[in-house]
Amino acid sequence: MAPKRSRRSNRRAGSRAAATSLVYDTCYATLTERATTSFQRQSFPTLKGMGDRAFQVVSFTIQGVSAAPLMYNARLYNPGDTDSVHATGVQLMGTVPRTVRLTPRVGQNNWFFGNTEEAETILAIDGLVSAKGANAPSNTVVVTGCFRLAPSELQSQ
């Protein structure tokens, strides 16, 4: 008679690590020609309300619409970096809404600490050249960020 096999359990013994959660947050901005619009933690209402929880950028979706064509470039930053780590390249915004997705490259997706300075830039969008020149109407962008939040147990003290 063959020995009896025990059933294996997929459950781990002991405590499990706290899971991270994904949060989508949206903010609105106006781009102007030859100017940079910066987005910080305080720009996103949900991140601002999370207190000192650390977060990681998963992706940004930028949707822009403008009465006159406007070229722009979006840049993504890592914590503490003064130079961008990834960019969309030159994009064109016009009367038809266009969506561009910006994700960090592998190895460049670092955590922003919970006590991130209010002035630390996460995303910057440069308005480059408009077809109307100085008389260009406002150019609206909707920026939706997907962020990974650290577990609340790991909040900064």
UniProtKB/Swiss-Prot annotation:
Designated name of the protein:
Coat protein
> Keyword Kinase: yes or no?
no
List GO molecular-function terms, semicolon-separated.
Answer: structural molecule activity
Q: Which InterPro entries match?
A: Satellite_virus_coat (IPR010392), Satellite_virus_coat_sf (IPR037164)
Q: Which Gene3D superfamilies match?
A: Satellite virus coat domain
Key words, A-Z? Capsid protein, Virion
Q: Does the keyword DNA repair apply?
A: no
Which compartments is it annotated to reside in? Virion
One CC-aspect GO term: viral capsid
Q: Please indicate which superkingdom the organism of origin belongs to.
A: Viruses
SUPFAM superfamilies, per this entry? Satellite viruses (SSF88650)
